[in-house]
Design a protein with these regions (language model features):
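Short, solvent-exposed mixed-charge patches
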Residues: 175-176
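Short, exposed beta-strand-loop hairpins at the edges of beta-sheets
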Residues: 146-170
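Beta-sandwich interaction modules
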Residues: 140-144
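Mature extracytoplasmic domains of secretory-pathway proteins
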Residues: 64-135
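Short, ordered beta-strand-loop transition motifs
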Residues: 39-42, 95-99, 109, 147-152
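Bacterial N-terminal signal peptides
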Residues: 12-20
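N-terminal export/targeting and maturation segments
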Residues: 24-82
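Bacterial N-terminal signal peptides that target proteins for export
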Residues: 2-11
């Protein structure tokens, strides 16, 4: 390499270094846990997380994401499939007119409104548990296999009372 080529190389390297140092890195997308669904069938768990935008607020395009943690296998993350999203673990979510929270409904619990919102450094999934406002933490589904598709015997919701901080739970049987 002659002096001219070496000079060009040095110039290119210093330009690359300067641009990479001065160009701000895009912040990584941040997710905060909302609640989980556990099942009696196996140890796999569905996680629902709040997705935050760059400004730290709930992402208006996709405020909530859901995925499996395959604990019965090796603990890897796996997306919900189409059938799971449509019939069991999917959800709808839309912004409230006030702009303070999002309405979320699980496809398996259409009549139970969940309010998702930012509360300081954490996010909340607030719903009624046993008739009282509570922060939802976990849903447990007791099910049995009939042929191929699991059939739920009951669903139990667990959370913390918004006012008192006391544990709350409610058992719901399908069709009731």
């Amino acid at each position: 390499m002659d002096k001219k080529q070496f000079g060009r190389y040095l110039l290119a390297a210093s330009l690359y270094f300067t641009v990479s140092v001065l160009t701000p890195a895009k912040p990584a997308t941040m997710y905060l846990p909302l609640f989980i669904i556990e099942r009696s069938i196996n140890a796999n768990v569905v996680h629902y997380d709040a997705k935050l935008s760059d400004d730290g607020n709930l992402d208006p395009q996709e405020p909530v994401v859901a995925y499996w943690i395959m604990a019965a296998k090796d603990g890897h993350r796996q997306e919900l499939n189409l059938l799971e999203r449509a019939k069991a673990y999917g959800f709808t979510v839309h912004a409230d007119a006030s702009g303070r929270f999002y309405h979320m409904e699980l496809v398996s619990q259409r009549r139970r409104d969940i309010h998702v919102y930012r509360d300081g450094d954490i996010v909340r999934a607030e719903t009624l548990i046993d008739g009282q406002p509570a922060y939802l933490q976990k849903v447990f589904v007791s099910a049995r296999h009939l042929v191929v598709i699991p059939t739920p015997d009951y669903v139990e919701m667990f959370g913390v009372d918004v006012k008192t901080g006391a544990p709350r739970s409610e058992k719901v049987r399908p069709g009731r």
